[in-house]
Amino acid sequence: MARGLRPPLNGGGTRFLLYPQLPGLSNEVEPEIVFVSSPAGSVGVGPQDHRMYVVDPIGKERPYGFYPDGEGGIFHYRPPWDGPVVPPAAPGPGGHFDHLPFGTPQFEHAHAFGTVRFVLDIWESYFGHHVPWHFAEAYDRLEIVFLRGLDNAYAGFGSLEIGNYMQAPGIPVDFGLSFDIIAHEVGHLVIYSQIGLPDTDDLDGEYYGFHESAADLVSLVSLMHFESAFIGLLEESHGNLYSYNLLNRFGEVSDFEQIRLASNERKLYEFVDGWSKEHALSQPLTGAFFDIWVDIFHSKLWERGLISLHLEELSDRLEGDPGYHDVIQPLFDQAYRLAPEGFAQALAEARHHMGISLAVTWQRLSPFELDYEDVYKAYLETDALINGGRYRDMIVDNMEWRGIGKVKAGPRIKPPAADSHAFSPRTQTPPSQPQPHICSHGMPYRLRMARARGKVPA
Protein backbone atom coordinates (compact mmCIF):
# COMPACT_ATOMS: atom_id res chain seq x y z
CA MET A 1 0.00 0.00 0.00
CA ALA A 2 1.06 3.59 -0.56
CA ARG A 3 3.69 4.55 1.97
CA GLY A 4 4.24 7.86 3.72
CA LEU A 5 1.35 9.89 2.35
CA ARG A 6 -0.89 12.24 4.27
CA PRO A 7 -3.75 10.44 6.10
CA PRO A 8 -6.61 11.13 3.63
CA LEU A 9 -4.82 9.00 1.02
CA ASN A 10 -4.40 5.99 3.28
CA GLY A 11 -7.93 4.64 3.37
CA GLY A 12 -10.22 7.59 2.73
CA GLY A 13 -9.93 7.78 -1.03
CA THR A 14 -10.47 5.63 -4.11
CA ARG A 15 -8.53 2.40 -4.59
CA PHE A 16 -6.52 1.59 -7.71
CA LEU A 17 -4.10 -1.18 -8.60
CA LEU A 18 -0.83 0.34 -9.82
CA TYR A 19 2.38 -1.28 -10.99
CA PRO A 20 5.44 0.54 -9.62
CA GLN A 21 7.45 -1.04 -12.43
CA LEU A 22 6.35 -1.81 -15.98
CA PRO A 23 4.99 -5.39 -16.08
CA GLY A 24 7.43 -7.61 -17.92
CA LEU A 25 10.56 -6.00 -16.50
CA SER A 26 10.61 -8.50 -13.67
CA ASN A 27 8.89 -11.81 -13.10
CA GLU A 28 8.25 -10.71 -9.54
CA VAL A 29 6.53 -7.38 -10.23
CA GLU A 30 3.06 -7.20 -8.72
CA PRO A 31 0.52 -4.37 -8.66
CA GLU A 32 0.03 -2.53 -5.40
CA ILE A 33 -3.18 -1.17 -3.91
CA VAL A 34 -2.98 2.62 -3.89
CA PHE A 35 -5.47 5.10 -2.46
CA VAL A 36 -5.82 8.41 -4.27
CA SER A 37 -7.39 11.52 -2.79
CA SER A 38 -10.61 11.43 -4.82
CA PRO A 39 -13.27 10.28 -2.30
CA ALA A 40 -14.65 6.80 -2.88
CA GLY A 41 -17.67 7.09 -5.16
CA SER A 42 -16.57 10.41 -6.68
CA VAL A 43 -14.63 8.91 -9.61
CA GLY A 44 -16.92 8.16 -12.51
CA VAL A 45 -16.82 5.97 -15.60
CA GLY A 46 -13.70 6.62 -17.65
CA PRO A 47 -12.27 6.95 -15.05
CA GLN A 48 -12.93 10.65 -14.54
CA ASP A 49 -13.15 13.19 -11.76
CA HIS A 50 -13.14 16.99 -11.52
CA ARG A 51 -9.43 17.25 -12.51
CA MET A 52 -9.01 14.68 -15.29
CA TYR A 53 -10.67 12.07 -17.49
CA VAL A 54 -9.58 9.12 -19.64
CA VAL A 55 -10.52 8.45 -23.26
CA ASP A 56 -9.29 5.64 -25.52
CA PRO A 57 -10.22 6.87 -29.01
CA ILE A 58 -11.16 4.76 -31.98
CA GLY A 59 -9.87 6.33 -35.18
CA LYS A 60 -7.51 8.96 -33.73
CA GLU A 61 -4.55 8.89 -36.11
CA ARG A 62 -2.09 11.47 -34.83
CA PRO A 63 -1.08 13.34 -31.67
CA TYR A 64 -2.55 16.68 -30.77
CA GLY A 65 -0.49 19.63 -31.98
CA PHE A 66 -0.15 22.18 -34.78
CA TYR A 67 -0.54 20.98 -38.37
CA PRO A 68 -0.73 22.54 -41.87
CA ASP A 69 -4.33 23.16 -42.86
CA GLY A 70 -3.72 22.50 -46.56
CA GLU A 71 -4.27 26.14 -47.47
CA GLY A 72 -0.96 27.56 -46.35
CA GLY A 73 -2.06 28.07 -42.76
CA ILE A 74 -1.78 26.20 -39.48
CA PHE A 75 -4.53 24.69 -37.37
CA HIS A 76 -4.36 23.56 -33.77
CA TYR A 77 -5.56 19.98 -33.31
CA ARG A 78 -6.35 19.72 -29.60
CA PRO A 79 -8.75 18.24 -27.04
CA PRO A 80 -11.41 17.21 -26.50
CA TRP A 81 -11.71 14.02 -28.52
CA ASP A 82 -15.35 13.77 -29.60
CA GLY A 83 -15.26 10.58 -31.68
CA PRO A 84 -15.94 6.94 -30.81
CA VAL A 85 -14.05 5.36 -27.91
CA VAL A 86 -13.16 1.97 -26.50
CA PRO A 87 -15.61 1.07 -23.71
CA PRO A 88 -14.33 2.90 -20.62
CA ALA A 89 -13.49 1.57 -17.18
CA ALA A 90 -16.35 1.59 -14.69
CA PRO A 91 -16.03 1.62 -10.90
CA GLY A 92 -16.77 -1.49 -8.91
CA PRO A 93 -18.42 -1.91 -5.52
CA GLY A 94 -17.84 1.08 -3.28
CA GLY A 95 -16.68 3.22 -6.20
CA HIS A 96 -13.18 1.69 -6.43
CA PHE A 97 -11.17 0.60 -9.49
CA ASP A 98 -9.11 -2.29 -8.13
CA HIS A 99 -11.46 -4.96 -9.51
CA LEU A 100 -10.56 -4.68 -13.20
CA PRO A 101 -8.77 -7.67 -14.79
CA PHE A 102 -5.20 -7.18 -15.96
CA GLY A 103 -4.78 -7.39 -19.73
CA THR A 104 -7.94 -5.45 -20.56
CA PRO A 105 -8.05 -1.91 -21.95
CA GLN A 106 -10.12 -0.93 -18.92
CA PHE A 107 -7.33 -1.97 -16.54
CA GLU A 108 -4.91 0.20 -18.50
CA HIS A 109 -7.39 3.11 -18.43
CA ALA A 110 -7.66 2.86 -14.65
CA HIS A 111 -3.90 2.42 -14.27
CA ALA A 112 -3.20 5.59 -16.24
CA PHE A 113 -5.78 7.63 -14.32
CA GLY A 114 -4.63 6.26 -10.96
CA THR A 115 -1.01 7.06 -11.77
CA VAL A 116 -1.71 10.67 -12.74
CA ARG A 117 -3.90 11.24 -9.69
CA PHE A 118 -1.45 9.51 -7.32
CA VAL A 119 1.54 11.56 -8.53
CA LEU A 120 -0.46 14.79 -8.41
CA ASP A 121 -1.53 13.98 -4.83
CA ILE A 122 2.08 13.36 -3.78
CA TRP A 123 3.37 16.61 -5.20
CA GLU A 124 0.47 18.73 -3.99
CA SER A 125 1.38 17.41 -0.55
CA TYR A 126 5.01 18.49 -1.03
CA PHE A 127 4.06 21.91 -2.42
CA GLY A 128 1.52 22.36 0.34
CA HIS A 129 -1.13 23.68 -2.02
CA HIS A 130 -3.32 22.89 -5.01
CA VAL A 131 -1.37 22.55 -8.27
CA PRO A 132 -3.56 23.99 -11.06
CA TRP A 133 -3.20 22.97 -14.68
CA HIS A 134 -1.28 25.50 -16.76
CA PHE A 135 -4.11 25.36 -19.32
CA ALA A 136 -6.86 26.00 -16.75
CA GLU A 137 -8.30 29.02 -18.54
CA ALA A 138 -9.00 26.86 -21.60
CA TYR A 139 -9.88 23.51 -20.01
CA ASP A 140 -11.19 22.51 -16.61
CA ARG A 141 -9.74 19.01 -16.85
CA LEU A 142 -6.77 17.12 -18.23
CA GLU A 143 -7.62 14.68 -21.01
CA ILE A 144 -5.65 11.45 -20.54
CA VAL A 145 -5.86 10.10 -24.06
CA PHE A 146 -4.52 6.87 -25.56
CA LEU A 147 -2.98 6.84 -29.04
CA ARG A 148 -2.05 3.28 -29.95
CA GLY A 149 1.13 3.15 -31.99
CA LEU A 150 2.56 6.38 -30.58
CA ASP A 151 6.03 5.39 -29.43
CA ASN A 152 6.06 7.79 -26.51
CA ALA A 153 3.92 9.71 -24.05
CA TYR A 154 3.44 13.48 -24.19
CA ALA A 155 2.16 16.07 -21.75
CA GLY A 156 0.70 18.92 -23.77
CA PHE A 157 -1.88 21.69 -23.77
CA GLY A 158 -4.91 20.11 -22.11
CA SER A 159 -3.83 16.52 -22.63
CA LEU A 160 -1.52 13.71 -21.69
CA GLU A 161 -1.21 11.36 -24.67
CA ILE A 162 -0.13 7.78 -23.98
CA GLY A 163 1.14 5.42 -26.66
CA ASN A 164 2.53 1.93 -27.03
CA TYR A 165 4.76 0.01 -29.41
CA MET A 166 5.73 -3.54 -30.28
CA GLN A 167 9.00 -4.51 -28.63
CA ALA A 168 8.93 -7.72 -30.66
CA PRO A 169 6.23 -9.49 -32.68
CA GLY A 170 3.35 -10.11 -30.31
CA ILE A 171 5.05 -8.34 -27.38
CA PRO A 172 3.50 -4.91 -26.83
CA VAL A 173 4.89 -2.31 -24.47
CA ASP A 174 1.89 -0.41 -23.14
CA PHE A 175 2.95 2.93 -21.68
CA GLY A 176 -0.37 3.16 -19.86
CA LEU A 177 1.07 0.52 -17.52
CA SER A 178 4.36 2.39 -16.97
CA PHE A 179 4.17 4.35 -13.74
CA ASP A 180 7.56 5.91 -14.48
CA ILE A 181 6.73 7.21 -17.95
CA ILE A 182 3.36 8.65 -16.94
CA ALA A 183 4.81 10.13 -13.72
CA HIS A 184 7.53 11.78 -15.81
CA GLU A 185 4.86 13.47 -17.96
CA VAL A 186 2.96 14.60 -14.87
CA GLY A 187 6.28 16.10 -13.79
CA HIS A 188 6.27 18.28 -16.90
CA LEU A 189 2.73 19.42 -16.09
CA VAL A 190 3.73 20.25 -12.51
CA ILE A 191 6.65 22.36 -13.75
CA TYR A 192 4.48 24.15 -16.34
CA SER A 193 2.08 24.97 -13.51
CA GLN A 194 4.53 26.05 -10.85
CA ILE A 195 7.16 27.82 -12.98
CA GLY A 196 5.18 28.79 -16.06
CA LEU A 197 5.48 28.45 -19.80
CA PRO A 198 8.07 30.63 -21.53
CA ASP A 199 6.58 32.99 -24.09
CA THR A 200 9.35 32.33 -26.61
CA ASP A 201 11.28 29.36 -27.98
CA ASP A 202 14.52 31.40 -27.84
CA LEU A 203 15.56 29.78 -24.58
CA ASP A 204 18.75 28.92 -22.79
CA GLY A 205 19.53 25.29 -23.59
CA GLU A 206 19.70 24.41 -19.93
CA TYR A 207 15.98 25.22 -19.61
CA TYR A 208 15.26 22.12 -21.69
CA GLY A 209 17.60 19.96 -19.61
CA PHE A 210 16.08 21.32 -16.41
CA HIS A 211 12.60 20.33 -17.56
CA GLU A 212 13.65 16.74 -18.25
CA SER A 213 15.59 16.54 -14.99
CA ALA A 214 12.67 17.88 -12.95
CA ALA A 215 10.27 15.43 -14.59
CA ASP A 216 12.64 12.55 -13.83
CA LEU A 217 12.91 13.66 -10.21
CA VAL A 218 9.12 13.84 -9.89
CA SER A 219 8.99 10.26 -11.13
CA LEU A 220 11.84 9.07 -8.90
CA VAL A 221 10.46 10.55 -5.67
CA SER A 222 6.94 9.37 -6.53
CA LEU A 223 8.18 5.81 -7.06
CA MET A 224 9.45 5.81 -3.49
CA HIS A 225 5.86 6.15 -2.24
CA PHE A 226 5.16 2.54 -3.20
CA GLU A 227 5.83 0.28 -0.24
CA SER A 228 6.97 -2.53 -2.54
CA ALA A 229 9.44 -0.24 -4.31
CA PHE A 230 10.60 1.41 -1.09
CA ILE A 231 11.22 -1.84 0.79
CA GLY A 232 12.41 -3.62 -2.34
CA LEU A 233 15.03 -0.93 -2.90
CA LEU A 234 16.42 -1.39 0.60
CA GLU A 235 16.35 -5.18 0.44
CA GLU A 236 18.14 -5.12 -2.91
CA SER A 237 20.73 -2.46 -2.12
CA HIS A 238 21.01 -2.72 1.69
CA GLY A 239 21.18 1.06 1.66
CA ASN A 240 23.94 1.38 -0.93
CA LEU A 241 21.87 3.44 -3.35
CA TYR A 242 24.66 3.63 -5.90
CA SER A 243 23.95 -0.03 -6.61
CA TYR A 244 22.26 -0.66 -9.94
CA ASN A 245 18.63 -1.12 -8.97
CA LEU A 246 15.10 -0.05 -9.85
CA LEU A 247 15.60 3.46 -8.45
CA ASN A 248 18.30 4.19 -11.02
CA ARG A 249 16.16 3.28 -14.02
CA PHE A 250 13.94 5.75 -15.86
CA GLY A 251 11.65 5.00 -18.78
CA GLU A 252 12.52 1.31 -18.69
CA VAL A 253 11.12 -1.01 -21.35
CA SER A 254 12.99 -4.24 -20.61
CA ASP A 255 15.37 -5.72 -18.05
CA PHE A 256 18.36 -4.38 -19.98
CA GLU A 257 17.20 -1.19 -21.68
CA GLN A 258 16.80 2.17 -19.94
CA ILE A 259 16.43 5.67 -21.31
CA ARG A 260 18.24 7.52 -18.55
CA LEU A 261 20.16 6.74 -15.35
CA ALA A 262 19.85 8.78 -12.20
CA SER A 263 23.13 7.49 -10.84
CA ASN A 264 25.45 8.73 -13.57
CA GLU A 265 28.80 10.46 -13.88
CA ARG A 266 27.95 12.95 -16.62
CA LYS A 267 29.16 16.51 -16.20
CA LEU A 268 28.16 19.81 -17.74
CA TYR A 269 31.68 20.15 -19.14
CA GLU A 270 30.66 17.59 -21.78
CA PHE A 271 28.13 20.04 -23.23
CA VAL A 272 30.07 23.33 -23.36
CA ASP A 273 30.47 23.01 -27.14
CA GLY A 274 26.79 22.30 -27.66
CA TRP A 275 24.05 19.73 -27.20
CA SER A 276 21.39 17.99 -29.26
CA LYS A 277 19.12 16.06 -26.87
CA GLU A 278 17.67 17.50 -23.69
CA HIS A 279 17.49 13.99 -22.20
CA ALA A 280 21.28 13.78 -22.28
CA LEU A 281 21.72 17.39 -21.17
CA SER A 282 19.52 16.70 -18.13
CA GLN A 283 21.80 14.02 -16.73
CA PRO A 284 24.36 16.23 -14.94
CA LEU A 285 21.59 18.01 -13.03
CA THR A 286 19.66 14.82 -12.24
CA GLY A 287 22.88 13.13 -11.19
CA ALA A 288 23.76 16.01 -8.87
CA PHE A 289 20.38 15.84 -7.13
CA PHE A 290 20.62 12.05 -6.87
CA ASP A 291 24.07 12.33 -5.28
CA ILE A 292 22.82 14.96 -2.83
CA TRP A 293 19.92 12.69 -1.88
CA VAL A 294 22.28 9.77 -1.27
CA ASP A 295 24.58 11.97 0.81
CA ILE A 296 21.64 13.15 2.92
CA PHE A 297 20.49 9.55 3.37
CA HIS A 298 23.99 8.53 4.47
CA SER A 299 24.10 11.51 6.83
CA LYS A 300 20.84 10.40 8.43
CA LEU A 301 22.16 6.85 8.78
CA TRP A 302 25.27 8.18 10.51
CA GLU A 303 23.20 10.43 12.81
CA ARG A 304 21.23 7.35 13.89
CA GLY A 305 24.44 5.42 14.54
CA LEU A 306 23.59 2.92 11.78
CA ILE A 307 26.79 3.43 9.77
CA SER A 308 30.18 4.69 10.83
CA LEU A 309 31.65 8.01 9.81
CA HIS A 310 34.39 5.96 8.16
CA LEU A 311 31.85 4.22 5.89
CA GLU A 312 30.15 7.49 4.97
CA GLU A 313 33.47 9.14 4.08
CA LEU A 314 34.75 6.03 2.30
CA SER A 315 31.60 5.87 0.17
CA ASP A 316 32.05 9.51 -0.83
CA ARG A 317 35.75 9.06 -1.56
CA LEU A 318 35.34 5.95 -3.72
CA GLU A 319 32.32 7.18 -5.66
CA GLY A 320 32.99 6.51 -9.34
CA ASP A 321 35.91 4.18 -8.56
CA PRO A 322 35.72 0.80 -10.39
CA GLY A 323 36.29 -0.96 -7.08
CA TYR A 324 33.51 0.91 -5.27
CA HIS A 325 31.03 -1.94 -5.14
CA ASP A 326 33.49 -4.61 -3.97
CA VAL A 327 34.70 -2.43 -1.10
CA ILE A 328 31.51 -0.69 -0.02
CA GLN A 329 28.74 -3.25 -0.53
CA PRO A 330 29.89 -5.74 2.17
CA LEU A 331 30.00 -2.90 4.71
CA PHE A 332 26.43 -1.86 3.86
CA ASP A 333 25.31 -5.50 3.95
CA GLN A 334 26.59 -5.84 7.50
CA ALA A 335 25.10 -2.54 8.71
CA TYR A 336 21.69 -3.20 7.13
CA ARG A 337 21.37 -6.66 8.68
CA LEU A 338 21.66 -5.07 12.13
CA ALA A 339 18.95 -2.40 11.70
CA PRO A 340 16.69 -2.70 8.62
CA GLU A 341 13.92 -0.62 10.24
CA GLY A 342 16.36 2.16 11.03
CA PHE A 343 17.49 2.21 7.41
CA ALA A 344 13.84 2.45 6.31
CA GLN A 345 13.20 5.39 8.63
CA ALA A 346 16.31 7.21 7.38
CA LEU A 347 15.33 6.63 3.74
CA ALA A 348 11.79 7.90 4.38
CA GLU A 349 13.22 11.05 5.96
CA ALA A 350 15.58 11.57 3.00
CA ARG A 351 12.72 11.04 0.55
CA HIS A 352 10.54 13.56 2.37
CA HIS A 353 13.40 16.05 2.49
CA MET A 354 14.03 15.72 -1.24
CA GLY A 355 10.35 16.18 -2.11
CA ILE A 356 9.94 19.26 0.07
CA SER A 357 13.24 20.86 -0.97
CA LEU A 358 12.57 20.34 -4.68
CA ALA A 359 9.09 21.83 -4.39
CA VAL A 360 10.42 24.90 -2.55
CA THR A 361 13.30 25.27 -5.01
CA TRP A 362 11.12 25.05 -8.11
CA GLN A 363 8.79 27.74 -6.78
CA ARG A 364 11.77 30.09 -6.60
CA LEU A 365 12.48 29.77 -10.34
CA SER A 366 11.25 31.61 -13.42
CA PRO A 367 11.24 30.16 -16.96
CA PHE A 368 12.80 33.35 -18.26
CA GLU A 369 16.55 32.81 -18.80
CA LEU A 370 16.51 29.73 -16.56
CA ASP A 371 19.77 27.79 -16.37
CA TYR A 372 21.38 25.22 -14.06
CA GLU A 373 23.17 27.87 -12.02
CA ASP A 374 19.77 29.39 -11.20
CA VAL A 375 18.61 25.98 -9.96
CA TYR A 376 21.83 25.55 -7.95
CA LYS A 377 21.47 28.95 -6.28
CA ALA A 378 17.77 28.41 -5.59
CA TYR A 379 18.54 25.05 -3.98
CA LEU A 380 21.14 26.66 -1.72
CA GLU A 381 18.55 29.28 -0.74
CA THR A 382 16.07 26.51 0.00
CA ASP A 383 18.59 24.69 2.19
CA ALA A 384 19.24 27.91 4.11
CA LEU A 385 15.50 28.47 4.49
CA ILE A 386 14.38 25.03 5.65
CA ASN A 387 17.60 23.55 7.10
CA GLY A 388 19.61 26.57 8.22
CA GLY A 389 22.24 25.71 5.59
CA ARG A 390 22.84 22.27 7.07
CA TYR A 391 23.53 20.59 3.74
CA ARG A 392 25.31 23.47 2.02
CA ASP A 393 28.66 21.70 1.70
CA MET A 394 27.01 18.60 0.19
CA ILE A 395 25.12 20.73 -2.32
CA VAL A 396 28.18 22.76 -3.33
CA ASP A 397 30.41 19.70 -3.69
CA ASN A 398 27.94 17.73 -5.80
CA MET A 399 26.81 20.60 -8.02
CA GLU A 400 30.30 21.91 -8.72
CA TRP A 401 31.74 18.43 -9.29
CA ARG A 402 29.24 18.26 -12.17
CA GLY A 403 30.39 21.65 -13.47
CA ILE A 404 27.14 23.33 -12.43
CA GLY A 405 27.92 26.91 -11.48
CA LYS A 406 31.27 26.58 -13.25
CA VAL A 407 30.37 26.31 -16.94
CA LYS A 408 27.32 26.61 -19.17
CA ALA A 409 25.99 24.37 -21.91
CA GLY A 410 26.69 25.58 -25.42
CA PRO A 411 24.11 26.07 -28.18
CA ARG A 412 21.75 23.45 -29.51
CA ILE A 413 23.59 21.88 -32.44
CA LYS A 414 20.63 19.97 -33.88
CA PRO A 415 16.95 20.91 -34.26
CA PRO A 416 14.55 19.58 -31.61
CA ALA A 417 13.82 15.89 -32.04
CA ALA A 418 10.31 14.48 -32.31
CA ASP A 419 10.43 13.46 -28.64
CA SER A 420 11.27 16.96 -27.37
CA HIS A 421 8.90 17.79 -24.53
CA ALA A 422 9.93 21.04 -22.96
CA PHE A 423 8.74 23.45 -25.63
CA SER A 424 7.06 22.06 -28.72
CA PRO A 425 3.84 22.43 -30.72
CA ARG A 426 2.26 19.99 -28.26
CA THR A 427 2.83 22.34 -25.34
CA GLN A 428 2.51 25.81 -26.83
CA THR A 429 -0.41 27.95 -25.75
CA PRO A 430 -2.81 28.61 -28.64
CA PRO A 431 -2.32 32.13 -30.06
CA SER A 432 -5.97 32.98 -29.38
CA GLN A 433 -5.58 32.17 -25.69
CA PRO A 434 -3.92 34.32 -23.03
CA GLN A 435 -1.14 32.65 -21.11
CA PRO A 436 -3.17 30.59 -18.64
CA HIS A 437 -0.55 30.19 -15.96
CA ILE A 438 -1.02 31.86 -12.59
CA CYS A 439 2.23 31.15 -10.82
CA SER A 440 2.66 29.99 -7.27
CA HIS A 441 3.92 33.43 -6.28
CA GLY A 442 0.38 34.78 -6.71
CA MET A 443 1.36 36.96 -9.67
CA PRO A 444 0.00 36.54 -13.22
CA TYR A 445 2.55 34.98 -15.54
CA ARG A 446 2.79 37.91 -17.97
CA LEU A 447 3.28 40.42 -15.15
CA ARG A 448 5.96 38.24 -13.65
CA MET A 449 7.77 38.03 -16.98
CA ALA A 450 7.47 41.79 -17.52
CA ARG A 451 8.95 42.35 -14.09
CA ALA A 452 11.79 39.95 -14.88
CA ARG A 453 12.58 42.04 -17.97
CA GLY A 454 12.54 45.24 -15.93
CA LYS A 455 9.54 46.65 -17.79
CA VAL A 456 7.56 47.13 -14.60
CA PRO A 457 8.94 48.05 -11.19
CA ALA A 458 9.46 45.38 -8.57
Model-predicted regions and their roles:
Residues M1-R117, D121-S125, W133-E137, Y192, ...:
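Acidic/polar low-complexity interaction segments
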Residues Q106-H109, F113-S159, N164-I182, I191-P457:
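Zinc-dependent metallohydrolase catalytic domains
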